[in-house]
Every structure is written in C-alpha cells, then in structure tokens.
C-alpha cells in the first residue's frame, strides 16, 4: 500500500472538496491517461487495486505511472466506543481527488489495449472518470 514514510502531523481535519484541479490535469508522461471527472477520496487500497487491474491486462508490455499519492490520514475510533475522549487513531491513508486530476498514465501499448486496461481500472474506483489520449497519438490512428 502507498503511504507517507514520515508526516509532520499524524491527524488532519476532514476538509472540504471544492474547486477543480489546474495542476496535475495534463498528460505528462504517457500517451493514454485516466482523468477524474468528479471529486472524492481514493484510498491506498483502491489505488493499488486499479493499478493491479491495469498491469494484469497489459501483461509485460507498457509502462504505467500513478500520478496521485495518498497523503491524507483518516482516523477511526475503536468499535463500541462512546463519543468523546478525543480523536481516534490514524487508520488509513487517502488521496484527495479534484475534478480534472490525472490519476494514471500509460505508454508503450496500442490504443485498444490501453483503453481496455484503463476501463478495467476505472471500474475499481469510486468516482466517475474518463479516458484521455494524447493528441499526436490520436491523429496517427
């Protein structure tokens, strides 16, 4: 699972999800990408599950980049605990996703294989996504 090695503050506020992503919204590494259409939290388990689905479909070919990292901690209180007595202990890590953020990128496979791999990955994620193709690659085919 993805998680930070060291953090300054173990516990964070929940925060609000508003606005769209201006940074991290373009294809920077690969020719094909999976882009978020709506906001949400992606847990480290979901990120890994989608990555596995992609790598299993492309088998040995291609290169995959994960463009997001779970750097926000979620806390949880033990089961059957009364309210109060402070915030719970850190339980899991999530990545905060804004609309327009590029989640995964892929290169080195043909368009049909890449689109199918990204579609399989999209089914593992709890938000709406779309598949994007680099313009010069789209013009070739």
From Swiss-Prot:
Cellular component annotations (GO), alphabetically ordered: cytosolic large ribosomal subunit
GO biological process: translation
InterPro entries (UniProt xref): Ribosomal_uL16, Ribosomal_uL16_bact-type, Ribosomal_uL16_CS, Ribosomal_uL16_dom, Ribosomal_uL16_sf
Keyword Ribosomal protein: yes
Gene3D superfamilies: Ribosomal protein L10e/L16 (3.90.1170.10)
MF GO annotations: rRNA binding; structural constituent of ribosome; tRNA binding
Pfam families linked: Ribosomal_L16 (PF00252)
Source organism, top-level taxon: Bacteria
Subunit structure: Part of the 50S ribosomal subunit.
Family: Belongs to the universal ribosomal protein uL16 family.
Name listed for the protein in its UniProt record: Large ribosomal subunit protein uL16
Organism of derivation: Syntrophotalea carbinolica (strain DSM 2380 / NBRC 103641 / GraBd1) (Pelobacter carbinolicus)
Upper taxonomic lineage: Bacteria, Pseudomonadati, Thermodesulfobacteriota, Desulfuromonadia, Desulfuromonadales
């Amino acid at each position: 699972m993805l998680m930070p090695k060291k953090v300054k503050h173990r516990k964070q506020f929940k925060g609000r999800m508003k606005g769209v992503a201006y940074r991290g919204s373009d294809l920077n590494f690969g020719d094909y990408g999976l882009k978020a259409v709506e906001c949400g939290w992606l847990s480290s388990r979901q990120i890994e599950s989608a990555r596995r689905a992609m790598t299993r479909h492309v088998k040995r070919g291609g290169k995959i980049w994960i463009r997001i990292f779970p750097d926000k901690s979620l806390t949880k209180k033990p089961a059957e605990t009364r309210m109060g007595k402070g915030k719970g202990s850190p339980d899991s890590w999530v990545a905060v996703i804004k609309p327009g953020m590029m989640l995964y990128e892929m290169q080195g496979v043909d368009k049909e294989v890449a689109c199918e791999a990204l579609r399989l990955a999209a089914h593992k994620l709890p938000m709406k996504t779309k598949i994007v193709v680099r313009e010069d690659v789209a013009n070739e085919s």
